[in-house]
Amino acid sequence: MAARKTYILKLYVAGNTPNSMRALNTLREILENEFKGVYALKVIDVLKQPQLAEEDKILATPTLAKILPPPVRRIIGDLSDREKVLIGLDLLFDELTETEYSGDK
C-alpha cells in the first residue's frame, strides 16, 4: 500500500466572527473525518496578520488554501458543503482514485 499524502492547508479568517468560526469548525470536522493524521492546518487571522494575507494575495475571507500536495487550490466563502470543499481542493478525486485502485476488487 502506498503511503498517504500529507495535506498542508491554510484557512484565512477575519477575526472571531460567527462566519469565521463556522468555517473553522466545519473544516476541522471534514479534515478529522477524511484526513485524520495526514493534514496540517494553519489558521491565519488577516486582521492580526495582514502581511500574510497580502503576501498570499487573499482578497476575501474565509479563504481555504491547499498548499501541498500541488497544485495549490483555493476556496473562497462558504465551507459548509463537504463535497464542494473536497472537490474544490482537488481532494475528492484523490480519495476516489485511491479507492478505485486499492486492490479490493
UniProtKB/Swiss-Prot annotation:
Pfam families, A to Z: KaiB
InterPro entries, per database record: Circ_KaiB, KaiB-like, KaiB_domain, Thioredoxin-like_sf
Keywords tagged on the record: Biological rhythms
Disulfide bonds: none
Keyword Amino-acid biosynthesis part of the UniProt annotation: no
SMART domains: KaiB
UniProt GO BP: circadian rhythm
Domain notes: Has 2 forms, fold switches to a thioredoxin-like fold (KaiB(fs)) when bound to KaiC.
Similarity field: Belongs to the KaiB family.
HAMAP family, per the entry: KaiB
Note: The kiaA gene has been eliminated from Prochlorococcus during genome streamlining. It has been suggested that the central oscillator in Prochlorococcus does not have to be as robust as in other cyanobacteria because the former live in specific niches of the Earth's oceans; they divide exactly once a day and at the same time. Thus gene loss and changes in kaiB function compared to other cyanobacteria, can occur.
Functional note: Component of the KaiBC clock protein complex, which constitutes the main circadian regulator in cyanobacteria; it may modify the ATPase activity of KaiC. May be a metamorphic protein which reversibly switches between an inactive tetrameric fold and a rare, thioredoxin-like monomeric fold (KaiB(fs)). KaiB(fs) binds phospho-KaiC, and perhaps clock output effectors.
Protein name per Swiss-Prot or TrEMBL: Circadian clock oscillator protein KaiB
Source lineage: Bacteria, Bacillati, Cyanobacteriota, Cyanophyceae, Synechococcales
